[in-house]
């Protein structure tokens, strides 16, 4: 969960495209057309769909796309309210199924075997999509996935209360239009205390604007009901869950719940990288993803850790 990356020049094989689909507007079966925005790279091989975290966007995957494009058809989709994908309609409560259908709509029409990669909220969306397409999704990578509702189901009430506190704060100040206040809390929670204070003025403006879709995303991750054991039956055995053992309490507890219920999965711990590692430490996270998806080992340049601000 972080602010969207700055605009970058597009290479010929990493272009911005869109697809006409349907959007839930003001009630069941009331749809209007809209465009699903995504970036793509590569032209052959299995389809890899990349699903970004909150307050980010499809551009967060640009380095990973570069490492995958020679062997996969890669699409990084913008969820509701990101990039050129329209915002979620305020009168409707968002669900994980809504976001999963959006990603499904962005699939190439001739897609066969599908691999999914999701970070944080994108991980929860990827889980839901994999459950919708069990015969087609062959591999799933979850980077600190955030289905917070599992905490309440499992009785992890301290962790659930911590997540609810953040949720309530975003809902309260978002409803008041005080997005800078909400953004400060959000940034410091996920990126560490003092993150907001270190941001430039322009970065604060961008972060506050990018936070707005998260107002609706909380409904999706809090109102889901699928039990942890059911995820074990619905999702592919070839699932990788990556977590920093020192990450925030709710994510640590979610990881523990899934470890206990989904024993056939692979688990990787990357100490000291934090929740935002896919953006701040791609040198450590991307090789894990590339390896698990079955791509040939490539020399992935290690880059220094970046920081918000």
Placement of each model-derived feature along the sequence:
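Gly/Ala-rich beta-loop-alpha elbow adjacent to hydrolase catalytic centers
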Residues: 118, 122, 126
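Flexible "cap/lid" loop of the alpha/beta hydrolase fold
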Residues: 127, 131-132, 137-174
């Amino acid at each position: 969960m972080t602010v969207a990356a700055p605009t970058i020049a597009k290479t010929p094989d990493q272009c911005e495209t869109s697809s006409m689909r349907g959007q839930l507007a003001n009630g069941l079966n009331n749809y209007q057309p809209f465009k699903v925005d995504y970036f793509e790279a590569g032209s052959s091989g299995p389809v890899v769909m990349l699903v970004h975290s909150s307050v980010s966007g499809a551009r967060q995957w640009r380095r990973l796309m570069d490492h995958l494009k020679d062997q996969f058809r890669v699409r990084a989709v913008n969820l509701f309210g990101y990039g050129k994908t329209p915002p979620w309609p305020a009168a409707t409560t968002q669900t994980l199924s809504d976001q999963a259908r959006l990603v499904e709509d962005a699939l190439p029409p001739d897609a066969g075997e599908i691999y999914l990669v999701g970070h944080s909220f994108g991980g929860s969306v990827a889980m839901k999509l994999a459950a919708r397409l069990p015969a087609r999704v062959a591999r799933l990578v979850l980077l600190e996935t955030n289905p917070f509702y599992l905490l309440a189901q499992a009785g992890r009430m301290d962790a659930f209360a911590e997540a609810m506190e953040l949720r309530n704060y975003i809902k309260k100040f978002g409803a008041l239009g005080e997005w800078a206040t909400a953004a400060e809390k959000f940034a410091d929670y996920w990126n560490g205390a003092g993150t907001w204070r270190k941001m430039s003025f322009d970065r604060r403006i961008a972060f506050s604007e990018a936070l707005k879709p998260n107002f609706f995303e909380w409904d999706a991750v809090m109102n889901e009901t699928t039990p942890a054991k059911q995820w074990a039956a619905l999702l592919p055995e070839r699932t990788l869950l990556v977590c920093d053992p020192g990450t925030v309490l709710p994510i640590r507890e979610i990881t523990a719940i899934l470890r206990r219920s989904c024993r056939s999965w692979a688990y990787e711990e990357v100490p000291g990288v934090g929740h935002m590692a896919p953006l701040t430490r791609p040198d450590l996270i991307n090789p894990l993803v590339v390896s698990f998806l079955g791509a040939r080992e490539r020399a992935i340049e290690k880059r220094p850790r970046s920081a918000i601000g």
